[in-house]
């Protein structure tokens, strides 16, 4: 998938560089990291460095500014976006038709990344708080509205790919819940995704969303989840670990263990055989 960086979303909207880092850059980098998980290709204009992050400062001036050199976090953030000023650049091979017109909000945007995206995969990534931060971002091409998926926060791309059947159930869960209360990175292959049918996936997703939204005290007392210690044996790997299970449906269970503020998912139970043993 080709995703274009929307340079029009840098319109000098941030009051200063601190505001840019706090209210613009953090969420933007979250989207970039999500894109990396799906090997998406980020394309941009070759002159993106000249667009303004504040009324007086450009992206280029921010990247070369040593004002924040003492702050490791800001240096890491800068490193994450320095690629915006490097190849690949789409304007070396533009797909825009010379005979076509491209407008946004009655403004001619020919030559911009949103215009280019309307001729490619129709996905852009943008900074927040600009006139072109809307989602969908509607481009009028030859008097026809072309809605672009506008990625302004992490999670949007994952949901889009999942709803369009472009990623597996496993990929969806691992990315969707990365860094949250549920962790799917240590699944036991013997009781993992192969036991779940396509028609059953949304039951699991609904329960996982609920689990993610509740506090741990609510999880422990929620009658629907019925979260409790599992007293049977899942396998020799987990014999020294206190494992737990919670209810996905009357028939389905999810097994795992608590590690700090996360529930590390070991696997899924769709036939009640494990629960019959503990």
Label the model's feature ranges.
Residues 252-265:
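Active-site beta-strand-loop-beta-strand hairpin of nuclease catalytic cores
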Residues 1-248, 263, 267-278:
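Basic, Lys/Arg-enriched alpha-helical interface segments
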């Amino acid at each position: 998938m080709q995703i274009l960086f929307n340079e029009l979303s840098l319109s000098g909207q941030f009051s200063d560089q601190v505001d840019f880092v706090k209210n613009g850059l953090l969420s933007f980098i979250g989207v970039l990291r999500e894109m990396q998980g799906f090997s998406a290709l980020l394309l941009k204009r070759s002159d993106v460095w000249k667009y303004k992050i504040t009324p007086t400062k450009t992206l280029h001036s921010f990247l070369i500014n040593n004002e924040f050199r003492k702050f490791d976090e800001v240096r890491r953030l800068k490193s994450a976006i320095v690629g915006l000023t490097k190849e690949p650049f789409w304007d070396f091979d533009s797909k825009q038709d010379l005979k076509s017109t491209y407008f946004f909000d009655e403004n001619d945007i020919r030559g911009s990344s949103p215009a280019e995206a309307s001729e490619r995969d129709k996905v852009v990534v943008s900074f927040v708080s600009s006139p072109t931060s809307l989602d969908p971002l509607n481009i009028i091409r030859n008097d026809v509205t072309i809605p672009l998926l506008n990625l302004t926060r992490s999670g949007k791309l994952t949901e889009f790919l999942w709803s369009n059947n472009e990623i597996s159930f496993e990929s969806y869960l691992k990315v969707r819940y990365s860094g949250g209360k549920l962790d799917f990175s240590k699944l036991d292959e013997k009781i993992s995704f192969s036991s779940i049918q396509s028609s059953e996936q949304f039951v699991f997703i609904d329960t996982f969303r609920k689990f993610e939204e509740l506090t741990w005290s609510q999880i422990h007392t929620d009658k629907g989840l019925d979260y409790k210690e599992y007293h049977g044996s899942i396998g020799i790997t987990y014999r020294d670990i206190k494992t737990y299970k919670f209810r996905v449906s009357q028939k389905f269970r999810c097994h795992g263990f608590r590690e700090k503020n996360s529930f590390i998912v070991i696997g899924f139970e769709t036939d009640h055989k494990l629960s019959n043993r503990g």
